[in-house]
Regions:
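Glycine/proline-rich active-site loop of Rossmann-fold NAD(P)-dependent oxidoreductases
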Residues: 126, 139-142, 154-174, 183
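Generic alpha-helical structural context detector
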Residues: 82, 151, 174-181
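Conserved small/polar residues in nucleotide/adenosyl-binding loops
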Residues: 187-193
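Alpha-helical structural motif
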Residues: 13, 34, 168, 172, ...
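Generic structural signal for nonpolar/small residues that stabilize regular secondary structure
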Residues: 147-149, 176, 189
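N-terminal Rossmann-like NAD(P)+-binding domain of SDR-like oxidoreductases, especially those catalyzing
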Residues: 1-157
Length: 197
């Protein structure tokens, strides 16, 4: 089962996934903020685990729109957890971010380092990680995995899927790739002082 609201993706990706995998799957166009829609999805499907990649993810935009980021990312995750709990689904893999290591910690990073952030996007990841820890502490039948990765890049070897956001990419390498293939035109690029290039 795949759920997406297409806020930063395209429906064509679904057909490409089917082509690559040779499998069909249920798809729901829904938003995590819509608890009724989530409950309908759980009602109609036997879901054992959730891989949670949903959320707004542009650091710069999060500084300009902090309320939208907190509402979408945190409230959306809370709605998802409520639906999961109601339907007895207690396994979740959460797409967090290496941004939770904050500016103080130095590489190489370890999972026992304290978390912090420098922007609303990062704080949503820190807060959601804590929410999921608290869910586990309250009921250790839950299985919670937190993925703290840097900006992943690349595509399937077929070239059918990879990062293809709506609009101009917010990450450097996808932006360079779109300039290289002529999808977007070159503009002078200024990196923030805290960029990890």
């Amino acid at each position: 089962v795949i759920v997406d609201n297409f806020s930063n993706s395209k429906p064509e990706a679904l057909n490409r996934i089917k082509k690559i995998t040779g499998k069909d799957f249920a798809f729901y166009e829904a938003d995590l903020l819509d608890l009724a829609a989530l409950e309908k999805i759980f009602e109609e499907n036997k879901i054992d685990a959730v891989i949670h990649f949903a959320g707004l993810k542009a650091v710069g935009e999060s500084v300009q729109k902090p309320v939208e980021y907190y509402h979408n990312n945190i409230t959306g995750t809370l709605m998802l957890i409520k639906a999961m709990r109601k339907y007895g689904c207690k396994k979740i893999v959460f797409s967090s971010s290496a941004t939770v290591y904050g500016p103080v910690n130095k590489a190489p990073y370890t999972e026992d380092m304290p978390t912090s952030a420098t922007n609303p996007y990062g704080y949503t990841k820190v807060m959601i990680e804590q929410i999921l820890r608290d869910v586990y502490v309250s009921d250790n039948d839950w299985s919670v995995s937190l993925l703290r990765y840097f900006n992943p890049i690349g595509a399937h070897k077929s070239g059918l899927i990879g990062e293809d956001p709506n609009g101009i990419p917010n990450n450097l390498l996808p932006y360079i790739c779109q300039v290289a293939v002529g999808t977007v035109s070159y503009t002078h690029l200024t990196l923030p002082t805290n960029s990890r290039v």
